[in-house]
Amino acid sequence: FTYAKNLMYDEESALFYRDGKYIYPKHKTNQGLKDFWSRGNGWVFAGLAKVLQDLPENDVHRAEYITIYKAMAKSLAAAQQEEGYWTRSLLDPVQAPGRETSGTAFFTYGYLWGVNNGLLDKSIYEPVIKQGWKYLTEIALQPNGKIGYVQPIGERADQHKNVGPETTADFGVGAFLLAGSEMVKYLNN
């Protein structure tokens, strides 16, 4: 984690670049901005929640992970779109506009876990959770039971690649189920 963090974590934005090829200013969005991939940051945010869940309280890295997790929570909240989703390029919605479910589900899970476990302030993050969950259950979840608007596998967020209600993938479904499992705990608290 330390190697990846040192290479790809942007302290200013509190987000991770996709990989070493996407680090600013070498790589920029079409608008000249930093490019942070939604699903990739979703894996990190949800991954930190999963690690913190099992990491001993006295682990030497725990405070560092909590600091990054909380900084990401703040940054991601500011990037959430009005409809409740996050765009494929987090800080440049024009780069690849429109709905994206896999990152949104990972973020919603991460926020739910943080509130459920006392690491995130419910009064601050409940609106983010509610908007994310509303998007997941009212827009991403299709009448036939499929989870739509999942960005396909690919190297970058391509504004010319259509992501629609029929676009699905197993990792999007898995992220949706993670969010759902944590929502049950949230509702029971």
Regions found by a protein language model. Give the residues of each.
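Acidic/Ser/Thr-rich, low-complexity mid-to-C-terminal regulatory regions of eukaryotic proteins
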Residues: G20-R39
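Oxyanion-binding "anion nests"
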Residues: F45-L91
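Long, well-ordered core segments of solenoidal/helical folds
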Residues: F1-G20, P25, I66-G84, P127-G145
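CBM-like carbohydrate-recognition segments
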Residues: W86, P93, G98-N189
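Alpha-helical bundle segments that constitute or directly flank the non-heme di-iron/ferroxidase center
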Residues: D35-K50, A105-F107, F176
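Short, surface-exposed loop/turn motifs that are enriched in glycine and acidic residues
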Residues: K34-W37, D59-I66, P93-T104
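Short glycine/proline-rich turn/loop motifs
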Residues: Y24-T29, S89, D158-H160
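Sec/Tat-exported extracytoplasmic proteins
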Residues: F1-M8, A46-L48, L52-L55, Q80, ...
